[in-house]
Curated annotation (Swiss-Prot):
Cu cation binds at H78, H80, H96, H159. It catalyses: 2 superoxide + 2 H(+) = H2O2 + O2. GO terms for biological process: removal of superoxide radicals. Residues 1-18 form the signal peptide. Superoxide dismutases serve to convert damaging superoxide radicals, a key form of ROS, to less damaging hydrogen peroxide that can be converted into water by catalase action. May be involved protection against extracellular stress. This is Cell surface superoxide dismutase [Cu-Zn] 6. Binds 1 copper ion per subunit. Binds 1 zinc ion per subunit. Zn(2+) binds at H96, D119. The GPI-anchor is attached to the protein in the endoplasmic reticulum and serves to target the protein to the cell surface. There, the glucosamine-inositol phospholipid moiety is cleaved off and the GPI-modified mannoprotein is covalently attached via its lipidless GPI glycan remnant to the 1,6-beta-glucan of the outer cell wall layer. Residues 289-316 form a propeptide. Residues 243-263 are annotated as: Disordered. It is found in: Secreted, Cell wall; Membrane. A lipid is attached at S288 (GPI-anchor amidated serine).
Amino acid sequence: MIFIPIIILIYLVSIAASDKSPKIKKNPRNVVAVADFPFGGDTQVKGNVVFSAKEGKHVNVHIDMTGLPKDEGPFFYHIHERSVPGNGNCEAVGLHFNPYNASPVCDEQKNDAYCQVGDLSGKHGCINTTCFELKYSDPYLSLNRKSKSYIIGKSVVFHYPNLTKIACADIEEANELRLQSLIDEYTQTDDAIQLKELNTPLETDYKFDEVEALSSEIYHSDTDSDPPQQELISTEKLYNKTDNVYSPEETRPSDQNKKSHRHSLLPLAKWKKNSPKNYSNISIHGISSDCLNDGMMVTGSVFGSLVLGIAAGIFV
């Protein structure tokens, strides 16, 4: 059959064609973004994803979710390129946020710089429980609206392994009322880390220079043995030329041609990175021991996963 060699060829080409994202060294300290669930899709999925950078450096991500379907994981989650329409249709959010045209096969890349900016589960691990809380920093996300990696106005989407969307929500800048409600949540749960992240006062004269910060978006060397490199990228290349607004559904491009995400069915073990994570059973919105995933099945063969992933990803 010709089909399988073609699959292998597409897989290899996608890996070779990966483009590299810069690390974001400066972010506004006075911006907090949040995706609140439920919004679109399954209304039983509740919680939030909070993005902040109170130190002015990398974006810190705090995920606290509950209500994902039992016995259906592992679950994948990504930032998608468009916001959720008013009718809550998760199919209208477009493809993964991928401003540097990276390969969808994050697991096979040299490092996370070659992954899609929005592929959060590819960079940080998929979820294998129905309720979870975790914290990590992602140096490839930006809260600077001039950056190509700017995430506000886009959406967070949770997927089944076959890429069917479960739930989605807009990433919005938190106003003072929403920020205070987050602080109240973390106060009730004694989450000192998040309280420090959100409740640290700024200097009265604090200002963030959006254009100047672009000069701090740099490529790093791929190997630890190489001397440090700080290759500055031209402002023109980094400047975010999209409007990042919630455009009416009828003005959005068609989403009929969906990209294949072949990594979605790779074995769960392949996704467990060595980087530390703050997985725990306690969640603000639930306790994961009350809703464990029993008997979760994951494809065990990379080649089998590749065939299934292409069949599920290209033609769905």
